[in-house]
């Protein structure tokens, strides 16, 4: 099976890139095998804390389709991605330390929205 495309985003602050892909039966040899399984019919998206391109750490959000990219689903997966990225740098979101997580969450949502709208150039 041919590699399916993904979009890589880097924000310049956190060392862990975010990758976003759309497709239920997505396959890409750049990624760990754990994230190349078909998304089940009732699951709109999945977020993976994984590695790609010769063991570089990354977070991958896979949406089953563009139709699945609703505000609710993007928000849900963006929070997973935010927590994975914070965990990678040894940080966490708390009531008393939420602002960095909020900005990171905002960035992840923005990346997903760019993919949804086809504005990734």
Short names for language-model regions:
Residues 67-71, 95-98:
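Aromatic-acidic/polar surface patches that form glycan- and anion
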Residues 77-78, 108:
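Amphipathic alpha-helical segments in well-ordered regions
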Residues 1-41:
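Short, charged/polar N-terminal "headpieces" of proteins
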Residues 5, 47-48, 121:
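N-terminal compositionally biased, intrinsically disordered segments and leader/signal-like regions
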Residues 92-121:
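Post-HExxH zinc-binding segment in Zn-dependent metallohydrolases
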Residues 73-75:
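A basic- and aromatic-enriched beta-loop-alpha substructure that forms the phosphate/nucleotide-
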């Amino acid at each position: 099976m041919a590699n399916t495309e993904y979009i890589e985003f880097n924000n310049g602050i956190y060392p862990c890139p975010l990758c976003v892909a759309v497709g239920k039966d997505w396959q890409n040899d750049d990624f760990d095998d754990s994230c190349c399984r078909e998304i089940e019919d009732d699951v709109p998206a999945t977020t993976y804390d994984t590695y790609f391109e010769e063991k570089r750490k990354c977070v991958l959000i896979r949406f089953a389709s563009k139709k699945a990219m609703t505000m609710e689903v993007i928000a849900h997966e963006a929070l997973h991605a935010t927590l994975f990225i914070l965990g990678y740098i040894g940080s966490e979101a708390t009531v008393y330390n939420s602002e960095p997580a909020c900005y990171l969450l905002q960035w992840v949502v923005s990346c997903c929205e760019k993919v949804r709208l086809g504005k990734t150039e």
